[in-house]
Amino acid sequence: MSELLSFALFLASVLIYAWKAGRNTWWFAATLTVLGLFVVLNITLFASDYFTGDGINDAVLYTLTNSLTGAGVSKYILPGIGIVLGLTAVFGALGWILRRRRHHPHHFGYSLLALLLALGSVDASPAFRQITELVKSQSRDGDPDFAAYYKEPSKTIPDPKLNLVYIYGESLERTYFDNEAFPDLTPELGALKNEGLDFSHTQQLPGTDYTIAGMVASQCGIPLFAPFEGNASASVSSFFPQNICLGDILKNSGYQNYFVQGANLRFAGKDVFLKSHGFDHLYGSEELKSVVADPHYRNDWGFYDDTVLDEAWKKFEELSRSGQRFSLFTLTVDTHHPDGFISRTCNRKKYDFDGKPNQSFSAVSCSQENIATFINKIKASPWFKDTVIVVSSDHLAMNNTAWKYLNKQDRNNLFFVIRGDKPQQETLAVKRNTMDNGATVLDILGGDNYLGLGRSSLSGQSMSEIFLNIKEKTLAWKPDIIRLWKFPKEMKEFTIDQQKNMIAFSGSHFRLPLLLRVSDKRVEPLPESEYSAPLRFQLADFAPRDNFVWVDRCYKMAQLWAPELALSTDWCVSQGQLGGQQIVQHVDKTTWQGKTAFKDTVIDMARYKGNVDTLKIVDNDIRYKADSFIFNVAGAPEEVKQFSGISRPESWGRWSNAQLGDEVKIEYKHPLPKKFDLVITAKAYGNNASRPIPVRVGNEEQTLVLGNEVTTTTLHFDNPTDADTLVIVPPEPVSTNEGNILGHSPRKLGIGMVEIKVVEREG
């Protein structure tokens, strides 16, 4: 209703101003600004819906000030360009319409009415309401009733008798199981759901709407609100260190806790969270690659669901035979947005909707089959009678190719329980949320019926039942939940441990690299993660007087304040203010002690602008002084004009990447020498080893042969045509996720370059 009212007010404002207000520059500018704000707000809402599937939520507030890198970003570039072009066109059209009667005399009354209607349209818009609520949530001090509702359970289960298998289905919300809306989409897992305790109204709340947040909510009974962006939690050394979570209780009760997934455990700090709360046995992509049947059978995120669930079954068998009490948690990945992935062993590889194949529905149908196969193996085993099986979605599906169809339904998270000891078949329509999952499991296992803000849906009352405005209430508790981190409020001294790649201050520990904004009463950590911008881009958003401490590889800050360190990959510490003074210190000891020193200086806006502009230079445009191309640092030597076909810097160098160009091309600013030696330190990837690799300068071509280990080769070139471009053509680029950023599409690797040097020959 508010959308219609808001749009009606917007339209009325446009029409009244265009046909009645007349000519006046100030009123035109004011009305266009407010109407433009309405357009921007609604486009922001549309864009946020596209990325999150949940409007302008807590995650969007972070994304608005940081670049989105990570899973499937290339799939969002075209919509992003479309939004920018559409916004430009709308503003142009709006200005043209408002000035239609610019030759008529100004009318104060109609101008005022048009402006008031425009302001009303903004105030009535859902986007404005969502942003207002988010901003309020950032500035609140908390809610006095938090302590009354947050309850810590007993640290043990008195007499545990059941093992636990807990399956997180990536984005596998309950909506998919509506057979009327999506016929025969989930027959295998749907049948199992109908055999157990099926909780049909599991709501998604703020701070529970992405994987690590859903895991924290379901195991600790609190949303994931932190002093930093949630997916950047890989940089912390402990996770809600004071809280009692399900894993802690299980471990204290004699359980061995296991977690198995196909993706890298470090992503979003799942390893830190689980290790902080009772899990001693973790298996992700790195741990599984030495034990799975086919280590090369992977998708963009890691191992496919059939591989992961096979390993989970082996672990279930092994643990059950041992007779020890255990919990086994597993997380699937094949249903990850935007398209999902199809395991090769499932029978349901294709699902048509609206008369055409739909990749996301196909991935859901395949993944649910794999999950059902795993559960049926457990049910058929002699150990089922001692086992509780839980299946839940980690969060609602984000914007995938099925999302517009999901939005036509009443959407809820999946949560059902199959008890081997006491079969129960019932659909429970009680209002609940993700935070109730852990408390419900704890209740079934014989423990308390509460966990944090969660309550057992079998014997307690959910916060979703107590509070009709539970989303707003959750946001009101946000400051209270952030305080549970016990995060320091000051930073005077710090220690850098090079062996562990950690920084410690005021009792807290973070992984490097790290950027910190330091004020009188707050220290704000800004870690680098798969979903955040590089730290230098985050620093570029700081105000001129903001105090910062930036710990990163020396070459990343060298172009600003320490050119002598431009080729150093050691750790450096920079601190100061962008508009004031900055210092760079080289970390030259294994354990390095530092102190913060922020001088109260006069802010120089020219210096500030120069620093910001330099920080925002993209990697490929960075230039450094050197007599060779060093590939393990960003940028290129000053003599290089541009280059292509080369991937990002890694600790050893850079790979060629045929996704960026079929050949490695390095164009120099000036012609290469008439006679020169080309000294190449490099290695080959896969089938490119021991194969002739063409290297061309102008009309002359030499052959390079590389192995799988780094070697140095010298090629002799004559350059009579004064060519300025070096071209290297890997013969057989290989599509692989080797060394890839989690969630990115595979790269096509050919050769790995460490250094290329041009040495002029005399004569």
Curated annotation (Swiss-Prot):
Pathway in which the depicted protein is active: Glycan metabolism; osmoregulated periplasmic glucan (OPG) biosynthesis
Membrane topology: Multi-pass membrane protein
EC number: 2.7.8.20
Organism: Escherichia coli (strain K12)
Keyword field: Cell inner membrane, Cell membrane, Membrane, Transferase, Transmembrane, Transmembrane helix
One of the protein's GO biological processes: glucan biosynthetic process
Subcellular location: Cell inner membrane
Known function: Transfers a phosphoglycerol residue from phosphatidylglycerol to the membrane-bound nascent glucan backbones.
Catalytic activity: a phosphatidylglycerol + a membrane-derived-oligosaccharide D-glucose = a 1,2-diacyl-sn-glycerol + a membrane-derived-oligosaccharide 6-(glycerophospho)-D-glucose
Regions that span the bilayer: 1-21, 26-46, 77-97, 108-128
GO molecular function: phosphatidylglycerol-membrane-oligosaccharide glycerophosphotransferase activity; transferase activity
Xref: PANTHER family: LIPOTEICHOIC ACID SYNTHASE, PHOSPHOGLYCEROL TRANSFERASE I
Top-level EC class as recorded in UniProt: transferase
InterPro entries in the cross-refs: Alkaline_phosphatase_core_sf (IPR017850), DUF7024 (IPR054288), OpgB (IPR020881), OpgB/LTA_synthase_biosynth (IPR050448), Sulfatase_N (IPR000917)
Any matching Pfam family: Sulfatase
Gene Ontology cellular component list: membrane; plasma membrane
Family matches, as CDD domains: LTA_synthase
Family per similarity comment: Belongs to the OpgB family.
HAMAP family per UniProt: MdoB_OpgB (MF_01070)
Protein name listed in UniProt: Phosphoglycerol transferase I
